[in-house]
Amino acid sequence: MSMSMGVRGLALRSVSKTLFSQGVRCPSMVIGARYMSSTPEKQTDPKAKANSIINAIPGNNILTKTGVLGTSAAAVIYAISNELYVINDESILLLTFLGFTGLVAKYLAPAYKDFADARMKKVSDVLNASRNKHVEAVKDRIDSVSQLQNVAETTKVLFDVSKETVELESEAFELKQKVELAHEAKAVLDSWVRYEASLRQLEQRQLAKSVISRVQSELGNPKFQEKVLQQSISEIEQLLSKLK
């Protein structure tokens, strides 16, 4: 039983090594094809690449990172040897997905970073422009308000002018009332004078009419006619006597 388990473990190790080597070769082939299809890039220093891989391992110093790496490798070997973890199709898919994700992260992350930086720069420019416009608007408002710093004196002068205007309007109204009153009094006096003149004319007409009627009545009286005749004869006789 132990021999069969050992054989099975060796078989699993060989299969895992084969799959791992195939999985490693596939990304290398993809990278090689990309390298051949595109312009040659500057090769990175192996030491710098190794340092970047080491820095990616969690830990504060080299001992901690080495312990984490060794523990992880021992755990993987132990899990595979004791059939706690069996490499199957899902594992291959997982490794392929992780390799593809790594490639995407390596080649698309810079482009996305550039896009994000450009977007952030655009938003930052818009915000800065809005802030500058707001600052200019505030400065213009401050300038417009500073021009009204003498508003108290101006208001006082305007109040004095309005007070003087009200006084002049009051005097003009009083003069207008006086003029209208004088016109009314003159109109009343004129009407009274016309009334008195009409009364005098009426009295004169009545007096003349009464005198004329009395004279006419006296002339129609025979005694008065005889008296007038006698008086006329006597006057004529006196004139004749004077002529002789």
UniProtKB/Swiss-Prot annotation:
More about this protein: Present with 12900 molecules/cell in log phase SD medium.
Protein name, per record: ATP synthase subunit 4, mitochondrial
Family in the record: Belongs to the eukaryotic ATPase B chain family.
A cellular component annotation (GO) from this entry: mitochondrial inner membrane
A single MF term (Gene Ontology): proton transmembrane transporter activity
Record key words, sorted: CF(0), Hydrogen ion transport, Ion transport, Membrane, Mitochondrion, Mitochondrion inner membrane, Phosphoprotein, Transit peptide, Transport
Entry's localization field: Mitochondrion; Mitochondrion inner membrane
Record-level GO BP terms: protein-containing complex assembly; proton motive force-driven ATP synthesis
Principal location listed in the UniProt entry: mitochondrion
Superkingdom, natural source: Eukaryota
Function of the molecule: Mitochondrial membrane ATP synthase (F(1)F(0) ATP synthase or Complex V) produces ATP from ADP in the presence of a proton gradient across the membrane which is generated by electron transport complexes of the respiratory chain. F-type ATPases consist of two structural domains, F(1) - containing the extramembraneous catalytic core, and F(0) - containing the membrane proton channel, linked together by a central stalk and a peripheral stalk. During catalysis, ATP synthesis in the catalytic domain of F(1) is coupled via a rotary mechanism of the central stalk subunits to proton translocation.
